[in-house]
């Protein structure tokens, strides 16, 4: 019907809260987050794509805003939300299926228990750059990350959860492990 819908904003607000807690940043109140989200989408509604397999990518983020080189939590922060129209991450093949070659990474790690893997922080992306470049060399679209301890248990794909269907059962990495 042409209306703009938000997908699980409550879960995104909760993830931001968890990230802020982990990074010693002040929590963004849920009502402020939602009001900001609605305001920026309303202001930029002409950027919302309407084509098949398109969406508006929404990236909320926060950073310390002060002059300091210390490795301490900041006293002042800025919370921002940026938007970008986007298409399908993976292109459909001739049969109309969306598939992708995935590179299994067994050397580097993206996250370890006790780390920041569950939080939305830039370092998680930075740590994956080498593996992403390796994947591209093999004509792969993304990286399948294995566990940090033994490099044999599936954790996640860089851009999404990984799951397997065996019979009637859906198997995925534990969501409470602290790494995804």
Language model regions located:
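Helix-start/capping segments and mature chain N-termini
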Residues: 1-40, 68-180
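Secondary-structure boundary/capping residues
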Residues: 25, 46-50
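Short alpha-helical segments and helix-capping/turn motifs at coil-helix boundaries
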Residues: 42-44, 63-68
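Extended, Lys/Arg-enriched charged tracts that mediate electrostatic binding to polyanionic substrates
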Residues: 49-63
């Amino acid at each position: 019907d042409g209306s703009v819908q938000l997908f699980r904003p409550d879960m995104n607000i909760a993830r931001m809260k968890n990230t802020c807690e982990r990074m010693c940043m002040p929590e963004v109140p849920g009502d402020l987050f939602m009001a900001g989200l609605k305001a920026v989408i309303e202001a930029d509604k002409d950027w919302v794509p309407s084509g098949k397999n398109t969406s508006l990518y929404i990236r909320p983020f926060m950073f310390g805003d002060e002059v300091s080189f210390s490795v301490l939590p900041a006293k002042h922060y800025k919370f921002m939300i940026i938007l970008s129209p986007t298409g399908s991450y993976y292109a459909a093949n001739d049969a109309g299926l969306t598939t992708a070659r995935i590179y299994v990474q067994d050397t580097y790690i993206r996250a370890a228990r006790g780390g920041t893997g569950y939080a939305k922080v830039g370092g998680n992306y930075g740590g994956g750059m080498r593996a992403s470049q390796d994947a591209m060399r093999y004509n792969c679209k993304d990286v399948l990350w294995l566990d940090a301890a033994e490099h044999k248990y599936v954790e996640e794909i860089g851009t999404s959860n990984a799951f397997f269907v065996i019979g009637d059962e859906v198997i995925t990495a534990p969501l409470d492990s602290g790494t995804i």
